[in-house]
């Protein structure tokens, strides 16, 4: 689920970060502050408001129900919850990368007739790839470790919406510390190996 959440985060977050870095929008500061609220708000608060949106009585939930699509307390809700919790990390990191690019390079591409979409893919993204990669890894690790938002929106349903943090919590509650320790070690080991691999890849590409 963390992988799907990261794909969703990249799809929405990278273009959003570029727009925030390169475009002057009305209410841009308010939008930036709103997008960064997941970094400071308690996960249960985020989960509550998200549930109010996607639940059966929520605005999004009602629209989806008209198409016989259930979102709350399904695996899709777990993916959405993890994406919402990690979205701000990718946006902030990628935005910093885009802002560090020399404007003249993008302006040169524009004078050659490239569209904004073409400039984004052929100039901005290649030059900011390190920041995008760093943000992707951070958001993936955040999605992998999400607990509060997922519990509020998707529940703790074994075989459906239960994630590794939720499983660890359940094992601790059941006093099954051996399984809790095993999952915790797997989680820590995976994240450490991932960080080492990404660091090595970044050095090779330098």
Provide a role label for each language-model segment:
Residues 2-14, 18, 44, 48, ...:
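Hydrophobic positions within alpha-helical transmembrane segments of bacterial inner-membrane proteins
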